[in-house]
Curated annotation (Swiss-Prot):
GO CC terms in record: endoplasmic reticulum membrane; nuclear envelope
Alphabetized UniProt keyword annotations: Endoplasmic reticulum, Glycoprotein, Membrane, Nucleus, Transmembrane, Transmembrane helix
Residue intervals on the Cytoplasmic side: 72-85, 138-144
Chief localisation class: endoplasmic reticulum
Protein name: Transmembrane protein 170A
Encoding gene, per UniProt annotation: TMEM170A
Organism: Homo sapiens
Amino acid sequence: MEREGSGGSGGSAGLLQQILSLKVVPRVGNGTLCPNSTSLCSFPEMWYGVFLWALVSSLFFHVPAGLLALFTLRHHKYGRFMSVSILLMGIVGPITAGILTSAAIAGVYRAAGKEMIPFEALTLGTGQTFCVLVVSFLRILATL
């Protein structure tokens, strides 16, 4: 029995639908033994789910901040480059540190033999971004 989105003629449309519907990692050939089809059971599924939400939530905060910096500092000689650094930190931060922390979270879940529902991945990924924002704000506040 072939699962929807696992290949064939409509495979790419089913794969895209599966990724966009919070079923984060496409299951090709039903290689996992999850009792629930919506839960994330394997390490790559959990890691990718948490990492993706950390990246998206980081961009959600850094893109408006970068655009605001670009708009307000557009006439400054060197200040206009601050917006580029804000945007880069919104991408580079989750890619470097987010990969490691998401792998640690997924490793703990996997070692405990626990499944992760997509809402937990959303909470843990956005929680990482929230912690980064709090630490960044407190660092700036300490310099004033």
